[in-house]
Amino acid sequence: MMRVLLIRGMLVGVLAGLLSFGVARVLGEPPVDRAIAYEEQMVAGHVAGAGEAGHHHGTTTATVHDHGTAEEPVSRDTQRGIGLLTATVVYGAALGGLFAIVFGFVYGRVGPWDARTTALLLAVAAFLTVYLVPTIKYPANPPAVGIDGTIVYRTQLFFVMIAIAIAAMIVAVMVAKASAEARGAWDATLIGGAVFIGSVILAGMLMPTLDEVPANFPATVLAQFRMASLAIQGTLWATSVLTP
């Protein structure tokens, strides 16, 4: 049973990856290209400024690595094509397999729902904990946004926020189940929801805040990139409902 469910989950994940690739190509790549163009423009301006300063002072005052003219190890055509397709399909397959394993564990244990309803509720819970809550605190950024030296730190904070959100969801479900008999299903759901929301809000307030967006970075590009990220993740998790 679990083997069949795992295979089905991975196949659904591959489908989710293909759909997400389409969403990423249509919605995600345009703001990425504009962000890269912005980065190249900033580098070109920096190089020009450094060269002008060196001309006036008789020496070169700064050395700048020009990302715009340096040969890329992987071309943008490869990145937006086979690279993006491979990434979304592999990620989707792994996500689908993990979703199937978790579904097999929780089905029949968390409520009297049928398989499809359980899958839907699990997908919503996973979307909230693994993506939405951490992203609200630490949103996705396109190229040219962020400091290279803080990449590891930002990644660590994001995963800590995921762990907190998952723990908050587990506690919320336990509280809701404990309250259901005395308060009824509706009140128990509201209580569990309040526990989850309150917990993640408190955690978000206590976690470090990062603000690395350049002051002159186009706000529309940033918004488009983050909306595309939301659409991609939404596609992945919505498709996972087809697992059972």
What are the language-model segments listed below?
Residues 1-244:
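Juxtamembrane/disordered regions of integral membrane proteins
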